[in-house]
């Protein structure tokens, strides 16, 4: 459950380490984002000489949330923390590697590139 000013870990090798949500996309007054939703983020922490710099504003897709997500079969899944993958303007991931597991819900949102790069899909 991500809202404005939530901080997230970055689960790819784009160079950003931490980002902060500045807008939840989808609806005029949408308050929360969950796994598979797209948010606008600002880079708060980045490693030097990387693809992204501190202060960059870009889109990201949520891949893990600490708040549990209910599945159609009635089961729930939750992770230890909140994480996102940075997206280019075309909607493709900026990084070439994904770190940590990602939720299966991304497959339904057609983020196949992220699913194929992830080491584990839960």
UniProtKB/Swiss-Prot annotation:
GO terms for cellular component: cytosolic large ribosomal subunit. CDD domains: Ribosomal_uL14. GO terms for biological process: translation. Keywords: Ribonucleoprotein, Ribosomal protein, RNA-binding, rRNA-binding. InterPro entries: Ribosomal_uL14, Ribosomal_uL14_bac-type, Ribosomal_uL14_CS, Ribosomal_uL14_sf. Pfam families: Ribosomal_L14. PROSITE patterns: RIBOSOMAL_L14. Gene3D superfamilies: Ribosomal protein L14 (2.40.150.20). It comes from the Bacteria. GO terms for molecular function: large ribosomal subunit rRNA binding; structural constituent of ribosome. Belongs to the universal ribosomal protein uL14 family. Binds to 23S rRNA. Forms part of two intersubunit bridges in the 70S ribosome. Part of the 50S ribosomal subunit. Forms a cluster with proteins L3 and L19. In the 70S ribosome, L14 and L19 interact and together make contacts with the 16S rRNA in bridges B5 and B8. PANTHER family: 50S/60S RIBOSOMAL PROTEIN L14/L23 (PTHR11761), LARGE RIBOSOMAL SUBUNIT PROTEIN UL14M (PTHR11761:SF3). HAMAP family: Ribosomal_uL14 (MF_01367). NCBIfam families: rplN_bact. This is Large ribosomal subunit protein uL14. It comes from Desulfovibrio desulfuricans (strain ATCC 27774 / DSM 6949 / MB). The lineage of its organism: Bacteria, Pseudomonadati, Thermodesulfobacteriota, Desulfovibrionia, Desulfovibrionales. The gene is rplN.
């Amino acid at each position: 459950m991500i809202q404005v000013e939530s901080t997230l870990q970055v689960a790819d090798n784009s160079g950003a380490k931490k980002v902060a949500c500045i807008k939840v996309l989808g609806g005029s007054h949408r308050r929360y984002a969950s796994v598979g939703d797209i948010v606008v983020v600002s880079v708060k922490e980045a490693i030097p000489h990387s693809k992204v710099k501190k202060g960059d504003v870009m889109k990201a897709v949520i891949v893990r949330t600490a708040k549990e997500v209910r599945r159609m079969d009635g089961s729930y899944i939750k992770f230890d923390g909140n994480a996102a993958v940075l997206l280019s303007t075309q909607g493709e991931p900026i990084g070439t590697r994904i770190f940590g597991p990602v939720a299966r819900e991304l497959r339904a949102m057609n983020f196949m590139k992220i699913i194929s790069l992830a080491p584990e899909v839960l």
